[in-house]
């Protein structure tokens, strides 16, 4: 694919051809590139109660079954037993060792093979190949990111640090009641397209529109991602920004971060909503929400007050758009230079 498929000048550019949303071959090529990226694994508070956490979503992103362990530190390990390939762990738990439920092979929380029944007399056993492989793991302010030799967009976290690094993100608390998992009949990229512009807010999200100053809504681009900044109307909930914040003095209602390919970090005065956009097939996508609370007194207020309603409204639009782009009467559209710079930026990444 050539990046010139999407003209770098948004005023001249046409949107992605519909085949990006409808054809299996294009879908497979795009998703294969996800293994080059870092992906959200968990917030450290998710490992406070359980010290073993399988990462089911990573199979879709990097083609590997992974798990996190917490002992003297955090590790991302292969979740595949080195004996016969059984998954080592299928649910979060607390354990001093990892024990495969198939034939009892046991590993330390560092991934090293500890014990294997009925293996007396096996030559050259154990060896390093019997240990669980360790994957790349990066930690930023309590957020853990994993990958399988990731090489793309490694500097995105510096962008977050400069803007929201003042928040005590590491001390945010995982709230299981805010967990959601949806499956929608639409291509994953259509869901991302919708997220990356506030253009549709007055038409689709009536209640959210009442919270945000539409004319002040802005989009900022950086390598590997997009930031959208929602400004609160005068009477609505907003951040109490410190002087160290580059946005000090503004009524910020929300910071909406998207990192390629499918991570959304939505910072509200109450805390953080993490959304994962997980491709299942060319026309099927799973959306997973995790909530991490900073200030419970602000839950239910402001731009992040009713995420379930906003999600339902978005899903209806995205599923209807999937039906539309499958029509023979549609292939490509144009961008609003004022309102769709984030979508244009995303499409340039996909086309490259």
Show the residue positions of the predicted features.
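Short, contiguous pre-domain boundary segments
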Residues: 2-19, 171-172
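Non-catalytic accessory segments flanking enzyme active sites
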Residues: 20-61
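Generic structural signal for secondary-structure transition and capping sites
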Residues: 35-39, 86, 200
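Short Pro/Gly-enriched beta-strand edge/turn motifs at strand-loop
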Residues: 37-41, 48-51, 116-121, 256-261
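Short clusters of hydrophobic/aromatic residues that line enzyme substrate/ligand-binding pockets
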Residues: 41, 88, 113, 208, ...
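Short linear motifs in intrinsically disordered
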Residues: 43-49, 126-127, 253-256, 290
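Rieske [2Fe-2S] iron-sulfur-binding domain
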Residues: 47-150, 158-161
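C-terminal catalytic domain of Rieske-type non-heme iron oxygenases
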Residues: 67-71, 78-79, 138, 143-352
């Amino acid at each position: 694919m050539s990046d010139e498929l999407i003209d770098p000048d948004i005023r001249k550019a046409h949107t992605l051809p519909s085949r990006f949303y409808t054809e299996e071959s294009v879908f497979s090529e795009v998703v294969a590139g996800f293994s080059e990226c870092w992906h959200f694994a968990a917030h450290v508070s998710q490992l406070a109660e359980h010290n073993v956490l399988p990462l089911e979503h990573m199979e879709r992103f990097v083609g590997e079954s992974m798990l996190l362990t917490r002992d003297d530190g955090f590790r991302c390990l292969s979740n595949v037993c080195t004996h016969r390939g059984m998954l080592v762990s299928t649910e979060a738990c607390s354990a001093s060792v990892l024990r495969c439920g198939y034939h009892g092979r046991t590993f330390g929380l560092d991934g090293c093979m500890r014990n294997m029944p009925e293996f007396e007399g096996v030559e050259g056993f154990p060896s390093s190949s019997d240990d669980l492989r360790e994957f790349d793991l990066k930690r930023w302010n309590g957020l853990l990111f994993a990958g399988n030799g990731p090489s793309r967009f490694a500097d995105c976290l510096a962008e977050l640090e400069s803007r929201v690094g003042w928040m005590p993100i590491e001390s945010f608390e995982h709230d299981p009641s805010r967990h959601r998992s949806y499956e929608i009949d639409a291509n994953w990229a259509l869901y991302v397209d919708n997220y990356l512009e506030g253009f549709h807010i007055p038409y689709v999200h009536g209640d959210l529109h009442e919270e945000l100053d539409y004319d002040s809504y802005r989009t900022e681009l950086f390598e590997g991602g997009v930031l959208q900044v929602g400004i609160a109307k005068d009477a609505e909930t907003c951040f109490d920004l410190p002087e160290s914040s580059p946005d000090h003095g503004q009524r910020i209602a929300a910071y909406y971060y998207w990192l390629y390919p499918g991570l959304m970090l939505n910072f509200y005065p109450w805390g953080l909503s993490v959304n994962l956009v997980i491709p299942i097939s060319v026309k099927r996508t799973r959306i997973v929400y995790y909530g991490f609370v900073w200030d419970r007194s602000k839950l239910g207020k402001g731009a992040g007050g009713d995420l379930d309603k906003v999600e339902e409204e978005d899903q209806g639009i995205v599923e209807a758009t999937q039906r539309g782009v499958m029509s023979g009467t549609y292939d490509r559209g144009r961008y609003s230079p004022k309102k769709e710079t984030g979508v244009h930026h995303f499409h340039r990444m996909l086309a490259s």
